[in-house]
A protein has these predicted regions:
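Intrinsic-disorder/low-complexity accessory segments
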Residues: 1-517
Length: 517
């Protein structure tokens, strides 16, 4: 569409019905009034209706024997799998539209520029940074939106500075070559000073990256699907060098040549390998794990302080306290008169004082045992992001997450949780806070968990407010845990972006020192 289009009764990916909505100019409009309507519906409809008879049989089998008639996914649509914002419009649109044509990307790589930069919302920006660092070019990333020389650069934008690379005479040509390979737009910036309070090129928001030196554990004991799609993603989306290490030999090899190690979903790791990895992480390494490997690393034999839900009920109040800090940190309503009053306020309210009916440890265990019976099979749930964290560069505020019977991660305040399950939706009709198992939801909010597929109400309650992605500093390094498999079948491009951020940006943004060869 060439202009903004105002429409009515639009369905969001969250399932909300919005009475009045404006489709921004430049959106892709796919009409369903055409011969391929059945195919379009099959690949783009947000939700597929499951027959009541099927739901009855599935629930009965789950309760009776713990079995299921579902395959490994009960949800699929392109926009959610790809992490794209989309809406369903219930009316035919025909004004301000033109036939879509693939547009060529234009780059202005001017020799005398002080900075060359690319937009961080483009997933190819991660590969742009990776391929330049592969050629030993110093690269920076902007962690807060700025405007330089009239160009708006959102957080996550990649910048190459002339002054960082004084000895590279053909820097301009290298930038141009990589941008052409990736078909990504690059802008040339003549001044590094942001207007007013926006970041400048010499400030703390222009952070220097570290060249990733990547290894992935594989071979016996690992899920071949997860190994394969992770390997493919490294090749296809980044196109830089990496090593495959036989996990049985990891404890005998020299890991110092790597600063990033990926552990795909797999079996438990022996004690000696765990000790080797812990020592490597403490020296500045970035360890990234998926699904079953995450399940092991969050056990009593693993690494770090992230725990699984079933092991936290004796400290549920502490976890809820930290969660409330996180939620209330997003609030913008301040009573300025009370704040500036010199007299002490005797009516200050605290989040936990308003709660009624908190659950005991025994009740939490009983509920969890029951709710665990109904965990989903490949459904899509809503992930809310921390929009200030570097792991969420280039992602929407609500990221669709493919979820099944995964380890449910619990993080205290000293562990980052860049993605949690559940989209906060304002609802002014809710006047009191509500309890969801171990956690609580402040007044004035609803929580949307399900986006697509079969998610029983019990499962929604069980996974609500848990972490899908965590990042914890250990020594000089860090451990990054994905509850699921971020590259499922190479199709979940939304969560794949989180994974690529972890690999390429982790060594520079999340660690304190280098792994020295």
């Amino acid at each position: 569409n060439t202009k903004n289009i105002k429409v009515e009764n639009v369905i969001l990916q969250s399932g909300q019905l919005v009475t009045n909505y404006t489709i921004p100019a430049g959106s892709m409009i796919i009409p369903n009034r055409q011969p391929e309507a059945p195919l379009i519906a099959a690949i783009l409809e947000f939700d597929a209706d499951i027959d009541t008879d099927v739901l009855v049989e599935e629930r009965q089998k789950s309760l009776k024997s713990g079995s299921s008639i579902m395959y490994d996914t009960t949800a699929f649509n392109f926009t959610m799998m790809y992490g794209l914002d989309a809406v369903t419009v219930g009316e035919h649109l025909d004004s301000s539209l033109e036939i879509w044509k693939q547009s060529s990307v234009s780059s202005e790589v001017i020799k005398d520029a002080v900075i060359w930069a690319t937009n961080g919302t483009d997933d190819n920006s991660v590969a742009f940074a990776a391929r330049l660092m592969e050629q030993n070019i110093e690269v920076r990333i902007i962690d807060k939106e700025s405007t330089l020389s009239g160009h708006t650069l959102p957080r996550g934008s990649v910048a190459v500075l002339q002054m960082d690379n004084p000895d590279i005479s053909n820097l301009q040509n290298l930038v141009k070559t990589v941008s052409d390979e990736l078909n990504i737009s690059v802008v040339s910036i003549e001044s590094g000073f942001g207007p007013e309070e926006l970041p400048d090129w010499g400030g703390r928001h222009f952070r220097l990256l570290e060249k990733p030196q990547i290894a992935m554990l594989s071979h016996e004991g690992f899920n071949s699907y997860d190994v394969g799609v992770s390997w493919w993603s490294l090749d296809h989306h980044l196109g830089i060098r990496h090593s495959m290490i036989n996990a049985s030999l990891a404890s005998y090899g020299d890991l110092r040549r790597y600063n990033t190690i990926i552990i795909p979903s797999g079996r438990a790791i022996d004690d000696y390998t765990v000790d080797t990895l812990l020592d490597w992480v403490s020296q500045g390494g970035t360890l990234i794990a998926h699904n079953r490997s995450t399940r092991f690393l969050t056990s009593e034999y693993g690494i770090g302080s992230v725990k699984q839900l079933q092991n936290t009920f004796d400290e549920s109040e502490k976890y809820n306290f930290d969660l409330l800090r996180e939620i209330y940190s997003q609030y913008e309503n301040i009573d300025k008169d009370k704040t500036n009053n010199n007299i002490i306020d005797f009516e200050v309210s605290y989040p936990w004082e308003e709660l009624d009916g908190t659950l005991s440890e025994s009740e939490l265990k009983s509920r969890d045992k029951w709710q665990s019976i109904f965990m989903p099979s490949g459904s899509i749930v809503a992930g809310r992001i921390d929009d200030e964290h570097w792991l969420t560069f280039g992602t929407p505020n609500t990221i669709p997450v493919l979820y099944s019977n995964l380890p449910i991660l619990m993080a205290r305040s000293y562990v980052d949780a860049p993605v949690r399950i559940g989209q906060m939706i304002p609802n002014n009709e809710i006047n009191e806070p509500r309890i969801i198992n171990w956690s609580s939801l402040p007044a004035g909010n609803d929580l949307n968990v399900r986006m697509s597929g079969l998610v029983w109400p019990e499962a929604s309650q069980r996974i609500a407010n848990s972490a899908y992605l965590t990042r914890e500093r250990i020594g000089d390094g860090q451990v990054i845990l994905f509850s699921g498999e971020p590259n499922f079948r190479g199709a979940t491009l939304g969560t794949n972006r989180l994974w690529l951020n972890a690999i390429v940006y982790g060594p520079g943004l999340g660690t304190r020192s280098r792994i020295n060869p």
